[in-house]
Amino acid sequence: MSDKPDMAEIEKFDKAKLKKTETQEKNPLPSKETIEQEKQTSES
């Protein structure tokens, strides 16, 4: 196998065959409210 990709293979690749997937955030950041609540509970 060669290191370089086969350009003919790339050119004939059909993007329409790719399935559209919904990206799901695995680890969403907490909201500002959540952060404030956690700060208040850790301070007391």
UniProtKB/Swiss-Prot annotation:
Q: Which residues carry this modification: N-acetylserine?
A: S2
CDD domains of this UniProt entry? Answer: WH2_BetaT
Residue stretches of biased makeup (Basic and acidic residues): 1-25, 33-44
Classify the main location. Answer: cytoplasm
Q: Where is this region: Disordered?
A: 1-44
- State which tissues express it: Spleen, kidney, heart, and oocytes.
Enumerate the subcellular locations listed in this protein's record, separating them with semicolons. Answer: Cytoplasm, Cytoskeleton
Q: What is an annotated GO biological process for this record, any one?
A: actin filament organization
Q: Which Gene3D superfamilies match?
A: Single helix bin
Q: Any keyword Transferase?
A: no
Among the GO molecular function terms of this UniProt record, one is: actin monomer binding
What are the disulfide bonds? Answer: none
Q: Which UniProt keywords apply?
A: Acetylation, Actin-binding, Cytoplasm, Cytoskeleton
* A family per Pfam: Thymosin
Under the heading PROSITE patterns, the entry gives: THYMOSIN_B4
**Gene Ontology CC: one annotated term:** cytoplasm
Record-stated family: Belongs to the thymosin beta family.
Job of this protein: Plays an important role in the organization of the cytoskeleton. Binds to and sequesters actin monomers (G actin) and therefore inhibits actin polymerization.
The molecule here is called Thymosin beta-4
Instruction: Name its species.
Output: Xenopus laevis
